[in-house]
Amino acid sequence: AEIFYAESLEKLIPNMQDAKPTIMTAVPRFYQNLFTKINMNLKKQTGFKKKLINQTLILGKKMLKKSNLNFNEKIINFLCQNLVRKKIKKQFGGNLQAFISGGGALEQNIGEFLNSIGLPTLQGYGLTEASPVVSCNLPDLVKVDTVGPAFRTNKIKIAEDGEILVKGENVMLGYWGQKEETDKVIKDGWLYTGDIGEIDLNGYLKITDRKKDISVNLGGDNISPSKIENILCLNEYIKQAFVYGDKKNYLVAILVTEKVENESKIKIVLENINKNLNLIERIKKIIVVDEEFTIDNRMLTPTLKLKRKEIIKNYKHRLDKLY
């Protein structure tokens, strides 16, 4: 095997065309951007092309759910495979067998879209203390709202409070020279991951949140900021989102947006998103900022996750004004 590293995000597609990878790993934000760009391009199509793309998505989702295609659907899907999926796959080198997503939650409709359009996308889960992979979806049975079944070398169980526990030969012996810290996360051979999740009837693991990231509002309700942030970022006008509201009576958000003529456009977008959220999850007020969250300004981790404490520290004064 050979390993290739992309020169930059901007040069990723040309790099993939040169390298012709069979497997590629990336964090969810990459797939989120990819979803937005492909979607915007597909929306420009008209006539027969538009109908064919719509059928590609409809039939792709049907196959993803292991539903049988009738005779007519099989013929249409044959056309979709050769006229749509193969062409899209060729843009990524032509040999791609799977995208692997890890390092955070991949939104379900992004996973469905990419798999349906001809880009097999498998979501997995792991952490450094588990060397680092715990589970991953299987190519022949993809459940996009999960991170797949545990590897054969692993065992997974869910603690009473919902925390995911992992045991196996890949789990670390401990933190070097830090017995006290080790004892906090390894008990009776089980690694306490700090993630909250559940296991379905097929043994597929579903991550619901990071234990330390769950917010509790003034009413005592548990709220997942990352879930709401992912939903916000599905909109083509919202590039990044940070949701805030721990120990508050409503939620607010900091949004990094695409350039729009006026802020009222973003407010209309937010109103539409709020309609599909539970009452306690709705965003009441927003701050629109120009500066993106990046690794360089210390708002993102190296795996492109939000550094919540750093963002709160930088915007505390403006956040407080929203309450």
Language-model-detected regions and their locations in the chain:
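Conserved AMP-binding/adenylate-forming
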Residues: 24, 64, 80-205, 211-214, ...
